[in-house]
Amino acid sequence: METYIQESDISNEDDLKAFCDMYLRQNLASTDAIIAQEAYRLAKENDLQGLIRLENICHAIKLSPETRKGSMMMGRQFLQTVQPLNNSELFTIWCEKLKNKEIKSHYPVVYGIYTAMLGVDLRTSLETFLYSSITSLVQNGVRAIPLGQNSGVQTIFSLLPVIQETTSRVMTLDLEHLDNNSIGLEIASMKHEFLHSRLFIS
């Protein structure tokens, strides 16, 4: 997103809303949300090997090095935050595998595992995953454009129906529907690495 802001493609609240709407429907719905959903299901089945395979798929579908690095960093930070809150055997094993550098711990995989072990239903898991992804994006947009906090709140509020709609759509999909078709985002992410100045990683 920061690339688009510096290239003046995102310069106001309406642009930010349109970008986040597109990001939900065209990017998250066909990539990370499907990964998070599949991680949730595999965790419910206690399928460790399936989760490792899923994480390899997640790693492969992220074409930009910055996107890959950002997903792993977020996953590790999230894992570090929630690890003391969950003592399930699967979650403990996952933490050990990360410690031993056997896995990369991408964010959507960790999120799916954690919410499954937490006992929330799948819809809540997906809605909160999408909500947290979009609120982070909006907060970054508010800082980088820049916009006022009210614009950020209004943007998030306007996207709530899109989050619900996207959740319903993702729940009808599976790994066969995984599709990284957001070429513009991937190119922007690759260009982001070489921006003269930047506030965020991809």
Curated annotation (Swiss-Prot):
**GO MF terms held by the record:** nickel cation binding
Does Nucleotidyltransferase appear among the keywords? no
* UniProt keyword Ribonucleoprotein present: no
Q: Where in the cell is it found?
A: Cytoplasm
Q: Any signal peptide, and if so, which residues?
A: none
Looking at the UniProt record for this protein, which Gene Ontology cellular component terms does it annotate, in alphabetical order?
A: cytoplasm
**Predominant place of localization:** cytoplasm
Q: Which UniProt keywords apply?
A: Chaperone, Cytoplasm, Nickel insertion
Family membership, please give it.
Belongs to the UreF family.
PANTHER family assigned: UREASE ACCESSORY PROTEIN F
Self-association and partners: UreD, UreF and UreG form a complex that acts as a GTP-hydrolysis-dependent molecular chaperone, activating the urease apoprotein by helping to assemble the nickel containing metallocenter of UreC. The UreE protein probably delivers the nickel.
Q: What does this protein do?
A: Required for maturation of urease via the functional incorporation of the urease nickel metallocenter.
Q: What is this protein called?
A: Urease accessory protein UreF
| Taxonomic source organism | Sporosarcina pasteurii (Bacillus pasteurii)
Query: What gene, per UniProt, encodes this protein?
Result: ureF
